[in-house]
Amino acid sequence: MIETIEQLRAAVYGQAVGDALGVPYEFQDRDSFACANMIGHGTHNQPAGTWSDDTSMMLATLDSLIGNDWQVDIEDMQHRFNAWLYDGEYAIDGNVFDSSYKRNPQTTSFR
């Protein structure tokens, strides 16, 4: 079990770091930049190390799974997604940026 937890922890860190590396370059052509360091600003004008909705939603998903003894509870998961989207939970400094989810009737109807 410890090995599985360590693998999960490594995957979560890898996701968050990779996401933060990519945030400044989102929507840019792959050949238009060289990512050599963690930088800030760029596409979303966020500080270096800021992750996006991808990591926030992964954290909300994991929080739901852990809170429900690793069972999928769709309603709980949706509540956690809404906590991210509307209250800034799982987001750095509570700042939700670049989210089209607030305009999506499928996500807002569950609120």
Briefly describe each language-model feature range.
Residues M1-R111:
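Structured, active/binding-site neighborhoods that engage oxygen-rich ligands
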